Every structure is written in C-alpha cells, then in structure tokens.
From Swiss-Prot:
Positions of transmembrane segments: none
Protein name, entry field: Translationally-controlled tumor protein homolog
Record bears the keyword Cytoplasm: yes
Job description of the protein: Involved in calcium binding and microtubule stabilization.
Gene name as annotated: TCTP
A GO term from the CC aspect: cytoplasm
Domain TCTP: from-to ranges: 1-167
Organism classification: Eukaryota, Metazoa, Spiralia, Lophotrochozoa, Annelida
Molecular-function annotations in GO: calcium ion binding
Species of the source: Lumbricus rubellus
Length: 167
C-alpha cells in the first residue's frame, strides 16, 4: 500500500486503497464514498449493578457520517473565502515550485504549465468545492479539494505536493 503525505507538514492525506486517477499529470483525483461509522458502548464498561427489578436501559450507539477519505486520514474541513483561497494557493504553488526546482527541476515546468487550468477551473466553480487540510492544520500545507458529482465525492490533491510512502 502507498500512503500519500503532504510534503510540507508531512501528514497523511490519502492512500492508494481508494480509486485514484491522475489528471493532467498534476492532480490526483480520488474517488470516495459516504459512509457511516457506528460506535456502541459496552454496558459492562459503565460499571454499577444491573437492577434485577428494572428493565434494561442500555446506552445508545453513536454514529458519525462522512466521506471515507476524510474519515480515514482524519482530514479537517477548512473554510476559506475565494479571495483567501487565492492568496493561499498562490503561496502554496510558489512553495511547491521552489521545492521542485531543488529536487526535480524537470517536473517544475510541467507542474506550472498543467496546474494553471485546474486552478482556474476550481476558482470558476469555487462554491462547489469543500476544502480540507491534514490534521496538523499547518498553514503551509496543502488544502485538498472535494467536489460532489451527484452521489459520489471526489477529492483532488496536487501530485507534486505529495510524498509517497510504501508500507
């Protein structure tokens, strides 16, 4: 299995256990699905004596619903205005570009060329996207994007802002 981590804070964003495709050699498109996790509390863990006279009053099960990618990687929703997102993405793209020029100069030009149309598409349809960051919530990290296509959530991650770790 491959775990994809944010280059800057180093937190896990997703793994290859989800269907992943590469868009324009720059953006990973990851297909998620809505799921509900139910957490039941064992009555024995609460303690006390069960009454022989009364009826059973157990504890209620709690549940949490969300997108599997978000829940598995403990991503945190991050609300930004379009203007604030533009400020963040400019700074983030510069950081990625600088990192690429140090480590993979050949990829730097490809990244700059191919990422611009995707960013433009996101900005044109910004209200349709939700933003998520890794659990460290570092300001220098990637903001992953999620957009719903009907009943299916898709998350988008910048390929060049990720490190791959085989486990």
């Amino acid at each position: 299995m491959i775990i994809f981590k944010d280059v800057f804070p180093g937190v896990e964003l997703f793994s290859d256990s989800f269907p992943v495709s590469l868009v324009n050699e720059t953006v990973y498109k990851v297909k998620g699905k809505l799921r509900t996790d139910t957490f039941a509390i064992d009555d024995k863990a609460i303690g006390g004596n069960a009454s022989a006279e009364g009826g059973e009053e157990g504890t209620d099960a709690a549940s949490k619903q969300g997108v599997d990618i978000v829940m598995n990687s403990r991503l945190v929703e991050y609300a930004l205005s379009k203007k604030d997102y533009m400020t963040h993405i400019k700074s983030y793209m510069k950081s990625v570009k600088d990192k690429l020029q140090e480590t993979k100069p050949a990829d730097s030009e490809l990244f700059q060329k191919n990422v611009q149309p995707f960013i433009k598409e996101v900005l044109n349809d910004f209200k349709e996207y939700q933003l998520f960051c890794g659990e460290s919530m570092g300001p220098e990290g990637m903001l992953a994007l999620m957009k719903w296509d009907g009943e299916t959530p898709y998350m988008f991650f910048f390929k060049h802002g990720l490190d791959e770790e085989k486990v």
